[in-house]
Amino acid sequence: MLEQMGIAAKAASWQLALLSSREKNQVLEKIADYLEAQTDDILRANAEDLAEARANGLSEAMLDRLALTPARLSGIANDVRQVCNLADPVGQVIDGGLLDSGLRIERRRVPLGVIGVIYEARPNVTVDVASLCLKTGNAAILRGGKETWRTNAATVKVIQQALQECGLPAAAVQAIDSPDRALVGEMLKMDKYIDMLIPRGGAGLHKLCREQSTIPVITGGIGVCHIFVDETAEIPPALKIIVNAKTQRPSTCNTVETLLVHRNIADTFLPALSKQMAESGVTLHAAPSALPALQNGPAKVEPVKAEQYDDEYLSLDLNVKVVADMDEAIAHIREHGTQHSDAILTRTLRNANRFINEVDSSAVYVNASTRFTDGGQFGLGAEVAVSTQKLHARGPMGLEALTTYKWIGFGDDTIRA
């Protein structure tokens, strides 16, 4: 089955690579319209997925990731329209010039070809990936989690209808709809057809892909994110940022999981934090350095376990640790962070610059929430993933991350001397 999907996707990719920006945008507009026109069908499929997932004991965090509502689906359709408004990177000349030999050379952006994406209970990923791939002239082979197979099937059906309506092959966007896990292993060996693989899921999936894939893999999306409250931080705005970073949507990978507090501000800051977290329904997991100050506050507090510093909670849970100085804060982030998103709250430019330079994450913030690590927030449109590695892309992966380049030389019967 996968062999035939790969053959069809590769053939479709050649056709997509030749489309103009106008033609690609027509497809995307059609997809957005069809998503809205067939909302009831997609939501019906999603309701069946939700019912099965709840019966199977999925956590509330996972159920939130899985759920679609009319508002969320409308937002997904609007995200597709936003991709239409983005500049098409394909064909863009990156650099070049006239060489001494008389050869005029340029480096031009081109599609990667076929993108494979393996993801878990995130039905919006289906549309996000499809829209970004189509905008950049790439075909896509998608393998969603078994929790979302009905939703994914309904969504891909809509996308394929739009493709065919525009005279393009349905194979430009395909989904593996079988829940058979053996197919994941088979997909990882499809380097003959798939040019880049992106896993979006837990640490186990990323490890599997890194160890078994013969396809270049972009990993990321696991967010053990930190906020360091410097001794010069102003408490009211700091609390506002922390509430946003923890509670706005706890199931996302850019949610803060560990709070590091400078000891010189801890006596004043921790009681205020406890009050705010109690109001927000957040359970605090406190290090011995923070536990005495937090135990007397209104927030629910538990002693933190060492392994919890490596946990991506995706829930209303927050580790709290008092540190001696920035050295200890940076050392903690280096040991337990996932190079996703980390922030410092400070009023000292010197401290801000040091944190920026020494914390090696894909996104580093000064006096801002970690929740901004998102393609839409960065002005990239929808994102295909957040990469926490350094090759070939880093941070939210927008359109440019789905392209490569080729060197083109223009001569006038030019030969090498």
From Swiss-Prot:
<dbReference type="InterPro" id="IPR012134">
    <property type="entry name" value="Glu-5-SA_DH"/>
</dbReference>
<dbReference type="GO" id="GO:0005737">
    <property type="term" value="C:cytoplasm"/>
</dbReference>
<dbReference type="InterPro" id="IPR016162">
    <property type="entry name" value="Ald_DH_N"/>
</dbReference>
<keyword id="KW-0521">NADP</keyword>
<dbReference type="GO" id="GO:0004350">
    <property type="term" value="F:glutamate-5-semialdehyde dehydrogenase activity"/>
</dbReference>
<keyword id="KW-0641">Proline biosynthesis</keyword>
<keyword id="KW-0560">Oxidoreductase</keyword>
<dbReference type="InterPro" id="IPR016161">
    <property type="entry name" value="Ald_DH/histidinol_DH"/>
</dbReference>
<dbReference type="InterPro" id="IPR015590">
    <property type="entry name" value="Aldehyde_DH_dom"/>
</dbReference>
<keyword id="KW-0963">Cytoplasm</keyword>
<dbReference type="Pfam" id="PF00171">
    <property type="entry name" value="Aldedh"/>
</dbReference>
<dbReference type="GO" id="GO:0050661">
    <property type="term" value="F:NADP binding"/>
</dbReference>
<keyword id="KW-0028">Amino-acid biosynthesis</keyword>
<comment type="similarity">
    <text>Belongs to the gamma-glutamyl phosphate reductase family.</text>
</comment>
<dbReference type="InterPro" id="IPR000965">
    <property type="entry name" value="GPR_dom"/>
</dbReference>
<comment type="pathway">
    <text>Amino-acid biosynthesis; L-proline biosynthesis; L-glutamate 5-semialdehyde from L-glutamate: step 2/2.</text>
</comment>
<dbReference type="GO" id="GO:0055129">
    <property type="term" value="P:L-proline biosynthetic process"/>
</dbReference>
<protein>
    <recommendedName>
        <fullName>Gamma-glutamyl phosphate reductase</fullName>
        <ecNumber>1.2.1.41</ecNumber>
    </recommendedName>
</protein>
<dbReference type="InterPro" id="IPR016163">
    <property type="entry name" value="Ald_DH_C"/>
</dbReference>
<comment type="function">
    <text>Catalyzes the NADPH-dependent reduction of L-glutamate 5-phosphate into L-glutamate 5-semialdehyde and phosphate. The product spontaneously undergoes cyclization to form 1-pyrroline-5-carboxylate.</text>
</comment>
<dbReference type="InterPro" id="IPR020593">
    <property type="entry name" value="G-glutamylP_reductase_CS"/>
</dbReference>
